[in-house]
């Protein structure tokens, strides 16, 4: 019987799930919006909310707890420096899951997982800067 079983297995081992959510969290922190399947997005949203709550605490223990989950130092740095300040007046509900249709290959339901009050002008800014640097390096 499946009584009191809280999370989806997503057809993965525990270590694979843990690594996948760590990578998804790092991507969500970097881009502030990711496209994934609906079940993954629904599982990821509460995990990301907990990470933002840790960032709002801002102390060393919270930073180490976040680093143990995300395992990406630049993502944790952005989490604490940017999101901790951005969401200091908001009590929970830091993520939004928006259904986005179905994937053509296998008809899997797709969703957009995004941070509320995200900086829309920053979308793709890091990619544009990296691309410009690559072009400059190729020319010079």
Swiss-Prot record:
Record-level GO cellular component terms: cytosolic large ribosomal subunit
Keywords per UniProt: Ribonucleoprotein, Ribosomal protein
MF GO annotations: structural constituent of ribosome
This protein's record includes keyword Oxidoreductase: no
Lineage: superkingdom: Bacteria
Gene3D superfamilies: Ribosomal protein L17 (3.90.1030.10)
Matches recorded under Pfam families: Ribosomal_L17
GO biological process, one term: translation
This protein's record includes keyword Translocase: no
InterPro entries with a match to the protein in the record: Ribosomal_bL17 (IPR000456), Ribosomal_bL17_sf (IPR036373)
Subunit annotation: Part of the 50S ribosomal subunit. Contacts protein L32.
Family: Belongs to the bacterial ribosomal protein bL17 family.
The protein's name: Large ribosomal subunit protein bL17
